[in-house]
């Protein structure tokens, strides 16, 4: 059994996770994330801990940011978009058991005010402003289980996870 309560976007995500794992979930019902739901997540985090396991798309990232900003100490699980999609849809409910297990075994907790990587080092690694920057960002994101990110989000997540220039350079 997974001790923490997992926050997902909808009932199909809950069904998918429960088909493989003994878990309890809180559903945000998509972008309709109200104060009441945030308070439920806050209380759940105080009692048992919470894992945010949201879809690898723009709405999922907005919900993740809003919850992480409102509630310190949440754990985050990420899947890459290509690992959680059908021809027309993207979501946790489309990921395989192996992908879900992998994501849940690499949880990320955000701690603000860290800077293990300067903006200059980020550029020096070629993670922004180069022809192959998107490919390099994907390599880093996949290796450190950060989910698909644009440059700004990757920079923030790398610092929040305390990933150094040396660690990133080794991966690239």
Feature map (PLM): residue ranges:
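N-terminal, positively charged regions that mediate nucleic acid binding
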Residues: 4-16, 20, 28-37
């Amino acid at each position: 059994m997974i001790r923490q309560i997992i926050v997902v976007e909808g009932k199909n995500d809950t069904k998918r996770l429960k088909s493989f794992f003994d878990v309890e979930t809180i559903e945000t019902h998509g972008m309709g994330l109200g104060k009441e739901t945030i308070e439920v997540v806050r209380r759940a985090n105080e009692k048992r801990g919470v894992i945010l396991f949201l879809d690898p798309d723009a709405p999922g990232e907005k919900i993740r940011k809003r919850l992480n900003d409102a509630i310190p100490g949440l754990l985050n699980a990420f899947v890459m978009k290509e690992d959680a999609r059908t021809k027309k849809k993207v979501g946790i409910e489309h990921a395989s058991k192996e992908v879900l297990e992998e994501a849940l075994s690499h949880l990320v907790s955000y701690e603000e005010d860290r800077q293990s990587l300067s903006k200059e080092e980020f550029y020096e690694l070629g993670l922004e402003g180069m022809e192959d920057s998107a490919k390099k960002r994907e390599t880093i994101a996949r290796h450190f289980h950060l989910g698909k990110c644009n440059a700004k989000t990757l920079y923030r997540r790398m610092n929040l996870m305390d990933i150094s220039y040396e660690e990133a350079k080794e991966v690239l």
